[in-house]
Amino acid sequence: MNYLEIAGALIGLLYLWFEYRASIWLWPVSVIMPAIYIVVYYQVGLYADSVISIYYLLAGIYGWWMWLRHTPDKGEKPVSGTPSKLLLPMFVVLLVVFVLIGILLKTYTDSTVPWWDSLTTSLSIIAMWMLAHKYVEQWLVWLVVDIVSCGIYIYKDLYFTSFLYGLYTVIAFFGYLKWKQLMNLSYERV
């Protein structure tokens, strides 16, 4: 039994609760959780997931800063939709990162799931950036990441983590609905 994995999964549940509520407290937790998973993923040969956890840790600091940088007179950054002008650049970044990571994993590691690992990693980079900007559609990207990750983690015998990502899948659906509602409320106030 991997106690580090269990600790990471429990902290992940706390993170999920804060993210669902659009609470700024998701960010400190999003620094602790990936620090644990850097080790967990490396131990089972999910190298891209281990590296993406470093990104999550840094993105947690960035997201925290992004959410805090609004002045008191402006209030908290509102939930909004992803601007359409960003869709093509996001897709290009996704594609380039997916191919590069996939090639690196296939060529230089013993990963048994290089392309799946690359897919979840590249989608996660996009989703985390969208979360830092409070774009509601980040939940849809996480939905795909969570479904694919569930299968990967079962395959790798990370059952607690797979269970966590199963919960993430359900919460991603409801999180999208909740944030959509928050976005509509912020538009009504304007």
Model segments located where?
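Polytopic alpha-helical membrane-helix bundles and their juxtamembrane interface segments
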Residues: 1-22, 26, 70-71, 80-190
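Individual alpha-helical transmembrane segments in multi-pass integral membrane proteins
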Residues: 7, 49-58, 165
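Short, flexible micro-motifs
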Residues: 15, 48, 63-66, 160
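Helix-loop junctions on the outward
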Residues: 22-25, 37-52
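Core catalytic region of metal-dependent phosphoesterases/phosphodiesterases
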Residues: 28-31
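Membrane-embedded alpha-helical segments in integral membrane proteins
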Residues: 33-44, 96-103
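Membrane-water interface of transmembrane alpha-helices
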Residues: 55-72
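Membrane-helix interface linkers and caps
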Residues: 74-76
